[in-house]
Amino acid sequence: MTITAGMKCPSYGGEAVEAWGQQTMTVQGYVAGATPFFIPSNSVVNVTRSPNLITTIMVLDGITNNGNGTLTQRVWSSDGWGKDKTFPGTVWQILPAGQSGNRGLLIEDSTDFIAITDVSRVASCVFSGTVNVNGTYALPAKGLVFARWNDSAATLECDGNNIYSRQDYTGYDDIARSVNVDIAIFAVQAPVPGRGLNFINAAGQCTFSTTRRPFIFRNQFFSPGNSWVDIGNSMIALGSYGFNSSVASGWCNMRSKGLVMSGNSVKGGNGRVRSRWTDRYSVTGERYTGMSIPIIPAMY
């Protein structure tokens, strides 16, 4: 176990359920000064609205932090429809650094674990290891999934229950790709005290224990796009981050966007085929979700 600067506490802020007519999400249990973020489990849909023959593609365009414990989803549509929509996913917040009264063990730029009053939303690392993803991998626990892999042709996505691997491709076929992936899953389970270092709050609840690996966060984020970005020896949060729609074999094939990693570099990539329709009414193009994805050191 390594004790280092940047030990933060991720806190579960609730689940966004897919819905129409609304775009604002509440960060449940919001703490002032925390860093909220959203991990979408799906970021694209297509809707055919009668009498239109050409489908409307809608994509999660970004997230606005309103600064008051709420987040607003921004939605883009291929024909300017402008319908409000909530895309599904999970809301999280990274509790701020602090040190109450300068007492106890000071770990630089770290959450004051003793000041956490309620552990019901605290997430800790419940699984870490290397797994093989060959098309679909069922997660051993549901939570916030960070990953690292080395394959410049493998796009990874996650819907909260499964990791999906696809060849980064724009043709007709939906091609699975086998890739070994290092993952770390943070789920809402309070730490269990044991041998080693434990932090106990005033209510007698364990808020940190070296029986589980800590969440190390150094304020690093990645915004998905087509260009490779060096993120160092790090892991990145998996989700769904946009769409690509292209014509092949007489069909318009709409894919969701995921992430591709090669060495220390990461970029966006084309993932699963989510829908297809005749190219007589094609809608082509691509768009990434303009959002910041958290990055953590690859120490798990």
Where are the language model's segments positioned?
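Generic marker of "main functional regions" within proteins
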Residues: 147-149, 155, 191, 195
